[in-house]
Amino acid sequence: IVEEGLAASALERGGAAGEPKVALRRMGDPVLATAAGFAHGALESDTAVTFAGGTQLLAVVALLRHAGVEATLPVATTSFLAADPSANVEALAADLDAALTVTDPGFAGSSHSAMAGYARGEAKEGVAMGGVLALAERAGLSMAQVRQAIETVYGRLIDSESER
């Protein structure tokens, strides 16, 4: 995929090194620039920002670092992403001097089919779960309480689907 993107963008490997705007313009997801802009504005107004995600949000952190943002940039992710060697979020966060929080929702031991499936890798991240879990912890909620709430909402969704 990377090679196809480089060919389509007329970039060579490393051709935009040190030039994140060029890399983003040629190969990046436009939402990354939007997220970086929102975050930059929030940080300038002294609004707390937490990036909930993995590699994509670390790309936003990289854009902010290249833009000269020196503030603490917290990134919250799940143990699923932290354990993924292809994502390498811990090393990326360290390279970008981002404050990484990793939370484990404890789905692996769950008897609930959706959570057990998630723990087996049947679902993909992309729902800001790491940020939600980090905020839940800060609010004093246990992961058991979070799992119970997920089961309750999941049950309501399944029940409403079966009524259709």
Spans of model-derived segments:
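N-terminal loops that bind phosphate or other acidic moieties
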Residues: 1-164
